Amino acid sequence: MTAILERREATSRWAQFCNWITSTENRLYIGWFGVIMIPCLLTATSVFIIAFIAAPPVDIDGIREPVSGSLLYGNNIISGAVIPTSNAIGLHFYPIWEAASLDEWLYNGGPYQLIVCHFLLGVACYMGREWELSFRLGMRPWIAVAYSAPVAAATAVFLIYPIGQGSFSDGMPLGISGTFNFMIVFQAEHNILMHPFHMLGVAGVFGGSLFSAMHGSLVTSSLIRETTENESANAGYKFGQEEETYNIVAAHGYFGRLIFQYASFNNSRSLHFFLAAWPVVGIWFTALGLSTMAFNLNGLNFNQSVVDSQGRVINTWADIINRANLGMEVMHERNAHNFPLDLASVEAPSVNA
């Protein structure tokens, strides 16, 4: 018998690198999307931490009145934020090398634009990386599809809305109180609470929380016991076991009797599709609503919809909300303009008797 030995071809460094990047045996999968994701998210995180701690005040409204957002300039964890890029910059691309000096870049809020751009690219690549790993493992692509909902929401808040409003200064500040300020101003200017797509998003988030709690409690309550009464039921589960770990028939029967038969799923695949789709579709609609309101296609307006036979207005809840909106609009950017647009564009009512 003759043995033929062939010399193995030397693998190039590039091929070795490609194999390492795309290997599913790594403790953390990198992937080609990860090559972009990792430096982007590291950059965004590093600059955010530094700016949150030490960034000097930013002239957010472009009127030479800087607003302090960092911890070293008098804020705490609640009030601190990375202040959005100045209204004087608008939508211009504003990297460090476009400013005359580092001090000017910081004064005009350059870190905000740097963080947002790297963050959005990073989370988009994270979504692509989810798809890439699923593809290499032979899985279906729906994990990445589900993650597209928060990616769409973040993109709407940090990119689409500033584009529609004409300035990055209208983006959401990167902080706790800054987030709430953004929400209040958004309600004042766009009446988001009366927008059907926002309502769908609320139903998606709260409904998803309810369904998640219901599903988790039902599964935990219908585990198939593999242990004695003296041991934890959890000890009877072995990772990767072929047998089912809970009795879906028992869970279905319980829930069907609690409400009614057809309110309960008897198909595990349909159930888990529903659990995924409900919040995802709701958040998709919210992101779409934010993106339309960015261009001032606002929530429904029912102000002064009800009048009596004499033509006098009978106030409804819509009128109460409108009064609150005007109050919030008066309070924000108080030095950037004399009157809110809603008040400045309407002729003052007569005060004659």
Swiss-Prot record:
Pfam families: Photo_RC. Keywords: Acetylation, Calcium, Chlorophyll, Chloroplast, Chromophore, Electron transport, Herbicide resistance, Iron, Magnesium, Manganese, Membrane, Metal-binding, Oxidoreductase, Phosphoprotein, Photosynthesis, Photosystem II, Plastid, Thylakoid, Transmembrane, Transmembrane helix, Transport. The modification Phosphothreonine is found at residue 2. This is Photosystem II protein D1. Its EC number is 1.10.3.9. It comes from Oltmannsiellopsis viridis (Marine flagellate). One of its GO terms (biological process) is response to herbicide. Fe cation binds at residues 215, 272. InterPro entries: D1/D2, Photo_II_D1/D2_sf, Photo_RC_L/M, Photo_RC_L/M_CS, PSII_D1. The gene is psbA. The modification N-acetylthreonine is found at residue 2. Pheophytin a binds at residue 126. One of its GO terms (molecular function) is chlorophyll binding. Chlorophyll a ChlzD1 binds at residue 118. One of its GO terms (cellular component) is photosystem II. The record marks 344-345 as: Cleavage. Its main location: plastid.
